[in-house]
């Protein structure tokens, strides 16, 4: 009987099992990107500056203190980590747009599933971006370079050129420090209103740009201990009037045919009290909107992004991708909780760590990690009927997480 049973068991030759396509996610924080990569059916590896516990639970992570390669020696931590994955494609996460030296190095010797370095540098030069948009008759916020300051009357913002997450932004008035008058900063006319993001996907070849969707951004929320201009969350999908969306779609097209962007990219913009949108920044890589729109709308955007550079890899990976679970409500939000003071984290790691749906808490530090005041602690997620409902639930979730945070005395000078 045992022999007969073995005859009818299905035969699986493990030597013929094809591996999932591998990809290296590189950026300041890669957890959301890695989870999107998993949902798309790829096998991810990561290099980032946080190496959070939930990221480590699902992939191999190479932690680095900085993405800078100002010291271009083989002992540079970033270059050493990248060298271990020299044979697999690289996917850019947040912060990479501010590392021109690293982008140049990678483009010379690695396969990149992302926009070209030249295109990234164009849209990250504020004056060049504003002049380019004005040349095609788009309304833009006035921009001035750091060595040509406007009046200190509070109607301008001074921003780092290599900015991320709203860090380093201040109002340009009499209290602003003089060290902002350099080539590393620029001035942008101030406009008040809610902040939104739009997400696009563009093939490298000529053709239309796909408008993916809109999200509402949370900025400077005291409930999350965020600084005045600090990015601290996202809710989506968002809906805006048709005439506003039409203009946003046009911006997405211009960023491809005039500046050369491809793959996933996003823009941040403010809608003023008159209902007019004003572009404030371009993010030439996958953004926080990717995760929210994937989970809230049942999409697999990472595979669509990869298809812009390698259609066969994208098709192969989709064979491994599980169907997305149904949304739990109309909107999904993510909030970033910041440390109000120096603290130690005891946030428990969920078991198991989930990547195919929104976790209650993510970006979880290793137990006992000390986090300095003003630094991000973790992310919380919530579903709801609209932006206000989701935001209230996110703030409540943040209060629950704070129960696992312990104040720590400042380190001696």
Residue ranges and their predicted role:
Residues 109-176:
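A conserved helix-loop-beta module that forms one wall/lid of the active-site cleft
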């Amino acid at each position: 009987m045992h022999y007969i049973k073995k005859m009818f068991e299905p035969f699986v030759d493990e030597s013929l099992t094809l591996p999932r396509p591998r990809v290296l996610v590189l950026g300041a924080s890669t957890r959301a990107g890695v989870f999107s990569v998993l949902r798309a059916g790829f096998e991810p590896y990561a290099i980032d500056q946080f190496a959070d516990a939930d990221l480590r639970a699902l992939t191999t992570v190479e932690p680095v203190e900085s993405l800078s390669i100002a010291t271009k020696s083989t002992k540079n931590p970033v270059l050493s980590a990248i060298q271990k994955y020299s044979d697999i494609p690289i996917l850019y996460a947040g912060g990479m747009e501010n590392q021109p030296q690293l982008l140049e190095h990678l483009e010379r010797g690695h396969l990149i599933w992302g926009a070209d370095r030249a295109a990234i540098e164009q849209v990250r030069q504020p004056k060049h971006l504003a002049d380019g948009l004005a040349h095609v008759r788009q309304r833009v916020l006035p921009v001035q370079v750091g060595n040509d300051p406007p009046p200190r009357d509070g109607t301008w913002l001074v921003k780092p050129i290599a900015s991320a997450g709203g860090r380093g932004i201040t109002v340009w008035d009499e209290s602003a420090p003089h060290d902002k008058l350099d080539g590393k900063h620029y001035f942008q006319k101030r406009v008040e209103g809610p902040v939104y993001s739009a997400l696009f996907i563009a093939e490298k070849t000529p053709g239309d740009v796909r408008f993916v969707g809109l999200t509402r951004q949370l900025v400077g929320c005291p409930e999350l201990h965020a600084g005045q201009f600090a990015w601290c969350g996202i809710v989506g999908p968002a809906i805006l009037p048709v005439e506003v969306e039409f203009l946003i779609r046009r911006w997405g097209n211009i960023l491809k045919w005039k500046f050369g962007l491809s793959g996933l990219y996003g823009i941040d913009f403010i809608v003023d009290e008159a209902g007019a949108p004003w572009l404030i920044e371009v993010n030439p890589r996958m953004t926080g909107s990717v995760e929210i729109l994937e989970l809230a709308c049942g999409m697999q955007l990472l595979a669509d992004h990869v298809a812009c550079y390698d259609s066969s890899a994208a098709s192969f990976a989709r064979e491994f991708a599980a169907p997305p679970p149904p949304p739990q409500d109309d909107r999904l939000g993510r909030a970033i909780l910041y440390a109000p003071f120096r603290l130690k984290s005891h946030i428990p790691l969920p078991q198991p760590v989930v990547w195919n749906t929104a976790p209650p808490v993510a970006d979880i530090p290793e137990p006992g990690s000390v986090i300095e005041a003003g630094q991000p602690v973790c992310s919380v997620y919530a579903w709801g009927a609209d932006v206000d409902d989701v935001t209230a639930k996110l703030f409540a979730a943040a209060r629950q997480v704070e129960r696992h945070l312990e104040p720590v005395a400042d380190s001696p000078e």
